[in-house]
Amino acid sequence: MTRFRLGLVGAGRMGQVHVRAAAESSLVEIAAVADPIAASRLNLAGNGIKTYETAGDMIEAGEVDGVLIATPSNTHVDTVADIAARGLPILCEKPCGVTAEEARKAADVAERYKVHLQIGYWRRFVPELKQLRDDIRAGLLGNLYLVSCFQWDEAPPANSFRATGGGAFIDMGVHEFDQMRWLTGQEPTNFRVATSKTTFAGAVKGDPDAVQLLCDLSDGSSGLVSLGRRFPPGDACWTQVFGTSGFAEARFFWPPDGEAVFLNALQAQLEDFVQAARGGAPRGATASDAVAALTIAEAATELLSRDLNKAEGNNVR
C-alpha cells in the first residue's frame, strides 16, 4: 500500500518528534513541512521532506494527503480552519486551542467542510493504558473507588512560558483529563484544587510548582489529577486505579524508557489517523474530547486562580 503523505505544519519541538515517530512507519510519511521560520524548516529539510513557508503553499503543491498541525496552541483554531477549507483530513496536536470555545470552533469548522479532525491525545495509543482501560470496562477491578492520574516533569519550563501558558491545568492537565474520561467512560464533576507552596526555580505568579485536582466521577467514584513541575528522576506519568475487586497501576511513562513509549504511541496515533482518513473507524480523540478536556482545565484554573488570589489577599492583611 502506498504510504499516506502527511504535511506537517509547525517545525518546532513537537513537529520534530512527530517526524522521528513517522520514520519507522510503513503506512505514513512526513512528506512536507511548513513553517514561517527558515531555521526551523532547515532542521527538517532532507530525507525527502520538502519545505514551505506557509501551509497554503504546501497544500497547493498537491503532494500531501492530510495535515498534521503542531503549531503553538493559540494558533490551532485558525490553522484548522485554513486546512479544513482546503478539504484535507487533519490531525491536530492537543489541546486544539487554549479554551473550550476555541475547540468548539475547530469542531464546527471541520463539520462544515466535512473533513476528519482528530486530536493528538497520544496516551490512547499506549498499550499499557489500553489494557488498563479494557480491564476497567470489563469489571476486573470491580466498582471503582478512585482513579488517580499523575504527570510530573523533570524540571519546569522557562518562567516566561509559565507566566503566559495558562498554568499547569491547561498546558499539562488536559492529558490527564482526557485520559481519565477515556479510561473510565465517566465525566469528572465537582472540582476541588490544592497547591503546594514549595518552589524549585522561583515562584511564578499563577502557576505553582505542584497542583492537585480532586473530583467526582459520574459513576460515584473519585478522581485525582496530580501535576508537578519538578521530579528529579525525570519526566514521568503514571496511573493508579482502586476498585472493589482489585488495584492496578500503570507506570507507562517512566525514566529512562519514557521516550520510546512516547515515540511508539505517536507512530500508532499517526497510523490510526491514516486508517480513519481512508474511511476506517477512528480510535483517537475527537474535537468533542478536546472540548471536554479544556472545559475541565478551565474550571480547575478558575478555582486555582480564586484560591491564589484569596491567599494573596490574606497575606496582604
UniProtKB/Swiss-Prot annotation:
<comment type="function">
    <text>Could catalyze the NADH-dependent dehydrogenase reaction involved in rhizopine (L-3-O-methyl-scyllo-inosamine) catabolism.</text>
</comment>
<comment type="similarity">
    <text>Belongs to the Gfo/Idh/MocA family.</text>
</comment>
<dbReference type="InterPro" id="IPR036291">
    <property type="entry name" value="NAD(P)-bd_dom_sf"/>
</dbReference>
<dbReference type="GO" id="GO:0006740">
    <property type="term" value="P:NADPH regeneration"/>
</dbReference>
<dbReference type="InterPro" id="IPR000683">
    <property type="entry name" value="Gfo/Idh/MocA-like_OxRdtase_N"/>
</dbReference>
<keyword id="KW-0560">Oxidoreductase</keyword>
<dbReference type="GO" id="GO:0000166">
    <property type="term" value="F:nucleotide binding"/>
</dbReference>
<dbReference type="GO" id="GO:0016491">
    <property type="term" value="F:oxidoreductase activity"/>
</dbReference>
<protein>
    <recommendedName>
        <fullName>Rhizopine catabolism protein MocA</fullName>
        <ecNumber>1.-.-.-</ecNumber>
    </recommendedName>
</protein>
<dbReference type="Pfam" id="PF01408">
    <property type="entry name" value="GFO_IDH_MocA"/>
</dbReference>
<dbReference type="InterPro" id="IPR055170">
    <property type="entry name" value="GFO_IDH_MocA-like_dom"/>
</dbReference>
<keyword id="KW-0520">NAD</keyword>
<dbReference type="Pfam" id="PF22725">
    <property type="entry name" value="GFO_IDH_MocA_C3"/>
</dbReference>
<dbReference type="GO" id="GO:0005737">
    <property type="term" value="C:cytoplasm"/>
</dbReference>
